[in-house]
Amino acid sequence: MREDDIEIIYKNLHLDFVNKYFKNNKEKKKIHDNHSEWYKTHISSFDYLIYIFEDEEANFVAMTSYEILEDTAKINIYLNKDYRNKGYSQEILSESIDKFLNDNKNIKTLKACILEENLASKKIFENLSFIYDKTEICNDGLEYLIYRKIVRY
């Protein structure tokens, strides 16, 4: 991922989420600024890995990210809305996980945080052998379903 990907990611992945859950323009601006700073900080961090997926014409398709927490990695997938419901998510996620685990042999568990309403994500993670663990309120104040997959013992 490069710094010039930040606005593309925000526009294609985060803007709809922000508009849905935050109504105040001041809050939206703050979230946008936080988003930009977060990505700038994490691009060069050893505790985060971000993979960008593009189509043949170099259009943004998806992003997967991993936050490394000792022997656990928190995984996220964000798919451009223009590419949803076309069967790409599971293939992208599977490819991303394989690459990540190949490069990070110390990881034993993957953790996914999924909004309860996101049925597609639940199905994809379940298809990849993730198991529901618990419900948890995360950093953004929203409640998420926590799915885990043990990848090494």
PLM feature spans:
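Short structured motifs
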Residues: 35-38, 63
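A general structural-boundary detector
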Residues: 22-23, 40, 79, 112
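Acyl-donor (CoA/ACP) binding surface of acyl/acetyltransferases
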Residues: 1-15, 50-153
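Generic macromolecular interface patches on structured domains
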Residues: 19-20, 28, 45, 102, ...
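Short loop/turn motifs at secondary-structure junctions and domain boundaries
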Residues: 40-46
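A short, well-structured alpha-helix characteristic of acyl/acetyltransferase catalytic modules
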Residues: 1-36
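Generic structural signal for well-ordered alpha-helical scaffold segments
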Residues: 39-40, 101
